[in-house]
A protein has these predicted regions:
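Single, function-defining residue in the core of a domain
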Residues: 1-104, 112-119, 125-465
C-alpha cells in the first residue's frame, strides 16, 4: 500500500523529464521525504545517503530547474481539469535568504539595502470552492545589484522589466491549462501589482477570464469626452450589497463585511507604446467597485476597484467577480506557508539559483498540499478521508489521537481526520484563534508519517495493530 505522500509525489513529479529515469525516481523520493518532514534546509529533512543523494540532484547541472518546475505545473493543470472554472490568483513575493558573501543572490529591494534574496511570481490554481489544487506557474529570479538609474520619463522595453515575469507566468499557466485541462476556464486574479498596460493587453490576448485590481485612476473615454475611472464608477448605479467574510491575518481580525457594489462598462485610454505619451487606444473592460459600508474602528475598509473582462449587469454576476477576487488571499496564504509557515524556504542554505529553484519548487508543491488539506477540511469536511489519505495513515491518526469510540479500521471524514491531525500537532481548539492552520496541521502530519510507517511495517509483517 502506497502512502499518500509517495502517491502525491509520484503524481506531481513522476513525469519530470530529467534525462535519466533514476533522476526522476530520486526527485519523487525527495518530494515524498520533504512532504513528510518539510523544512527549508536539506539537512533537516534528510540524513546520511538520502541527504547526499538530495544534494547531488539539486546541484547537478544536467538536471534543469525548469524541468522540475514544468512537472509541477503539469500536475497542477491535471488537477484543475476536474473543474469547469479554476481561479488563478497571481502574486509576487520576495524571498529573503542568508548570503553573507553577497555574491549568490540579488537585492530584495529595487534600492540596494544590502538584504539579499530572490523574487518569485506565483500562479496558484484554486477550485471554485476555494481549495488550492496545484501550482499553475512560477518564476524565480534575482535582481541585479547594479541598478541603472533611468532618465526621467524613460521606460525600458517590457522584456527588460519584471512585468515580463508576470507575463511569462500568465502565459505558461494559460498554455499548460489549455493543453491538459482544455474544458477548464482559467480566471486570473491579479492585485494592484498586475495593473499595468502590458499585462492587461496580454491578458486580453489569452483565452482566459481575468480580474485585476485597479491601482491608478486611469483616464476613460465617454460620449462627452474624457473622465477619470473614479468619476465614471462613482456615477454608475448600485447593483446591491454583499456580505463578505474577511479572514484574519497577522494585522487583521476576522470579520464579516457588508459591501455595496456597482459596476459599469468603461473604455480605458491606454498608450500603445512605453513612453506613456501616446499614441493611445481604447481598451474596453467592466469596472466594478466594492465598498465596505461600516468597518470596525481601526480597521482598513474593504474598497476595491476591479477591472474584469466578465460581463457584470446583475448582482449575481458581481458576486461571482467579488468571490473570484477573494481567491487572491489564497496565494498570499500559500506564500506565507512556503516561506515561513509549513516549509520555511527562506531558511535554505543552498548557494546557487538553480539548486535553490529546484528545492523551492518541491517545497512550493508541499506548501500547496498543506494548504489544500487545510481548506478542504473547511469547505468539504464531509469528504471521505480515504480520498486524501491511505488506510495506514488513517489508522496511524486513530492510534495517536485515540478519538472516543473510534477504532483502527474505522472510516473517517477529511474534516475529522484533519482536526485529529491538528490535535496531534498541538492544536488547542478554536480558542487558539480559529480552525487549525497550516503550521499546526503540518506539525501533526510529521508525527503521523512516522507512525504510518510503523503501521505499514507491522501490516506487511502480518503483525497486529
Amino acid at each position: 500500500m502506497q502512502n499518500s505522500q509517495l502517491a502525491w509525489a509520484t503524481s506531481t513529479f513522476g513525469d519530470a523529464a530529467l534525462g535519466d529515469a533514476r533522476r526522476t525516481a530520486r526527485l519523487v523520493e525527495m518530494a515524498a521525504g520533504v512532504s513528510e518532514r518539510p523544512n527549508g534546509r536539506v539537512t533537516q529533512v534528510f540524513e546520511g545517503a538520502e541527504r547526499e543523494a538530495a544534494y547531488r540532484l539539486l546541484e547537478n547541472r544536467a538536471v534543469a530547474a525548469s524541468e522540475v518546475q514544468q512537472a509541477a505545473f503539469r500536475a497542477g493543470a491535471r488537477s484543475a481539469a476536474a473543474f469547469n472554472i479554476v481561479f488563478v490568483p497571481v502574486d509576487q513575493s520576495a524571498l529573503g535568504l542568508t548570503d553573507r558573501a553577497g555574491t549568490h543572490f540579488g537585492p530584495l529591494s529595487t534600492r540596494n539595502t544590502g538584504v539579499s534574496g530572490l523574487q518569485a511570481v506565483s500562479a496558484l490554481l484554486v477550485s471554485p470552492e476555494g481549495v488550492p489544487v496545484g501550482l499553475g506557474a512560477q518564476a524565480i529570479w534575482t535582481r541585479s545589484w547594479s541598478q541603472r538609474a533611468q532618465p526621467h520619463n524613460a521606460r525600458p522595453p517590457v522584456e527588460e522589466t519584471e512585468l515580463q515575469r508576470w507575463i511569462d507566468v500568465l502565459t505558461t499557466s494559460a498554455e499548460t491549462l489549455g493543453a491538459l485541462a482544455p474544458a477548464t476556464l482559467p480566471w486570473f486574479q491579479l492585485d494592484r501589482g498586475g495593473d499595468a498596460t502590458p499585462v492587461l493587453r496580454h491578458l486580453a490576448r489569452l483565452d482566459v477570464a481575468y480580474t485585476v485590481r485597479a491601482s491608478s485612476n486611469r483616464r476613460v473615454a465617454t460620449d462627452t469626452g474624457t473622465r477619470s475611472l473614479h468619476e465614471v464608477l462613482g456615477a454608475s448605479r448600485w447593483l446591491g450589497a454583499y456580505t463578505l467574510r474577511v479572514p484574519a491575518t497577522r494585522d487583521r481580525a476576522a470579520r464579516t463585511a457588508l459591501v455595496d457594489v456597482r459596476a459599469c462598462v468603461v473604455k480605458l485610454i491606454v498608450p500603445l507604446g512605453r513612453s506613456g505619451m501616446g499614441p493611445f487606444e481604447q481598451f474596453t473592460v467592466t469596472a466594478l467597485e466594492a465598498r465596505e459600508r461600516h468597518q470596525p474602528d481601526g480597521a482598513e475598509p474593504i474598497h476595491w476597484r476591479l477591472l474584469t473582462n466578465r460581463s457584470v449587469v446583475t448582482m449575481a454576476a458581481a458576486h461571482d467577480v467579488i468571490v473570484g477576487y477573494t481567491m487572491r488571499w489564497r496565494v498570499e496564504e500559500f506564500h506565507l506557508a512556503w516561506k515561513s509557515g509549513a516549509c520555511g524556504i527562506e531558511d535554505s542554505l543552498l548557494r546557487s539559483v538553480a539548486a535553490f529553484t529546484k528545492w523551492a519548487t518541491v517545497l512550493a508543491t508541499v506548501a500547496i498540499r498543506a494548504e489544500h488539506l487545510k481548506q478542504l477540511s473547511r469547505t468539504t469536511p464531509e469528504l471521505p478521508a480515504a480520498a486524501e489519505f491511505s488506510r495506514d495513515e488513517i489508522d496511524a491518526v486513530i492510534l495517536l489521537r485515540k478519538p472516543k469510540g473510534v477504532t483502527v479500521g474505522a472510516d473517517a471524514t477529511v474534516g475529522q481526520l484533519v482536526y485529529w491531525i491538528a490535535d496531534i500537532g498541538g492544536y488547542t481548539g478554536k480558542s487558539s484563534g480559529g480552525p487549525p492552520g497550516v503550521r499546526i496541521i503540518t506539525r501533526g502530519l510529521e508525527r503521523v508519517a512516522a507512525a504510518a510507517a510503523a503501521v505499514t511495517a507491522l501490516r506487511l509483517g502480518n503483525g497486529d495493530l
